[in-house]
């Protein structure tokens, strides 16, 4: 089974998102983080599911609304590069 790994920035993104959402609703934060990890496993299994991002060479994206998961293919699976809110200035965060 293909694997995924989290880049340090992606790990940080997930922690920040979880903390932020938990301030309002702990259960929602728990469900959201769970959805992220379910999505990572699915993307590892089917890496072409995500949208190719020509503006970010080597990256693909997949929405976990309202967030966007950015990842890249690796020989042994995928690497999750970032998990960003869709309303953020993604170009500046992925440079």
What are these regions (language model features)?
Residues 1-3, 73:
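Extreme N-terminus of proteins, especially the signal/transit-peptide cleavage junction
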Residues 3-55, 59, 95:
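Basic, Lys/Arg-enriched alpha-helical interface segments
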Residues 48-77:
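Basic/aromatic recognition patch in beta-strand/loop cores that engages polyanionic ligands
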Residues 67-68, 72-95:
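Enriched for short, Lys/Arg-rich terminal
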């Amino acid at each position: 089974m293909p694997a995924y790994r989290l880049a340090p920035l992606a790990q940080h993104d997930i922690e920040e998102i979880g903390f932020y959402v938990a301030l309002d609703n702990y259960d929602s934060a728990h469900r959201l983080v769970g959805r992220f990890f379910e999505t990572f496993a699915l993307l590892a299994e089917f890496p072409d599911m995500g949208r190719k991002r020509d503006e970010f060479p080597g990256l693909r994206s997949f929405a976990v609304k309202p967030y966007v998961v950015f990842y890249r293919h690796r020989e042994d699976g995928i690497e999750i590069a970032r998990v960003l809110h869709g309303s953020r200035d993604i170009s500046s965060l992925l440079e």
